[in-house]
Amino acid sequence: MPIVRAKPTSPGRRFVEKVVHPHLYKGRPFAALLESKSKTGGRNNNGRITTRHIGGGHKQHYRIIDFKRTKDNIPATVERIEYDPNRTAHIALLKYADGERRYIIAAKKQAVGDTVMSGELSPIRPGNCLPLKNIPLGTVIHNIELKIGKGAQMARAAGASVQLLGRDGIYAILRLRSGETRRVHVNCRAVIGEVSNTENNLKSLGKAGASRWRGIRPSVRGVAMNPVDHPHGGGEGRNKGRHPTSPWGQKSKGLKTRHNKRTDNMIIRRRAKKK
């Protein structure tokens, strides 16, 4: 899709770069697959901030996405490709042969009128969902289950993909974009192809207000705070006086924070460290 740079008619327009998607449906979403979505402002039930930098933003409805893809051997037609404010990927509205409609994450190059299927005997085509044991080696996949029947958890964002490298007994070996190589059970399902909206990372919001529309509040540097607010706060000038840390004193550069030993044996090779 073309990337359009806005004319600098105002300071807020000067740096705007957006990806144009003429194929997206212009009307309202399918009402039966919508749910209300209430904003928390990053607060918990006590009214205390549990996640910083959240607040405001445009009202949104949640689109109910079919991440399990368990409607097997029934062909579905892509009725339309839609924008979804809850994720970076686009979504596709499917109409099954029995009349049921469901939303799925749209695959790259998926178009209106395409036929989509789920199940072990589905053809290897973008958007089709199969168990990992039925997918040819070397295939690029997305929307991957980590537990059988739980629904897709991995590679769901715009442009995301994983490559199926091989199979070892009851496990499939996958290479992630991060460089990590890991095992997943061969009965877990995955969808063929890459996730749609691959150029999402090339856009530029252009102004602070565009982040506020998305419900993202400003991030204040620790060195600009007082000592009571952050370990980097206070002092004359801009010295931290210590290694970079979070507001709660945890080291924020290079410290390992993974504590899930239960799945350590599923990771064959760790992702590469940043240089």
UniProtKB/Swiss-Prot annotation:
GO CC, one annotated term: large ribosomal subunit
Keywords: Ribonucleoprotein, Ribosomal protein, RNA-binding, rRNA-binding
Cross-referenced SUPFAM superfamilies: Nucleic acid-binding proteins, Translation proteins SH3-like domain
Positions of the UniProt region annotated as Disordered: 222-275
GO molecular function, one term: structural constituent of ribosome
PROSITE patterns in the record: RIBOSOMAL_L2
GO biological process: cytoplasmic translation
Extent of Basic and acidic residues compositional bias: 229-239
A Pfam family that the UniProt record links to this protein: Ribosomal_L2
Entry-linked HAMAP family: Ribosomal_uL2_B
Family per similarity comment: Belongs to the universal ribosomal protein uL2 family.
Assembly mode: Part of the 50S ribosomal subunit. Forms a bridge to the 30S subunit in the 70S ribosome.
Name listed for the protein in its UniProt record: Large ribosomal subunit protein uL2
Species, as recorded: Psychrobacter cryohalolentis (strain ATCC BAA-1226 / DSM 17306 / VKM B-2378 / K5)
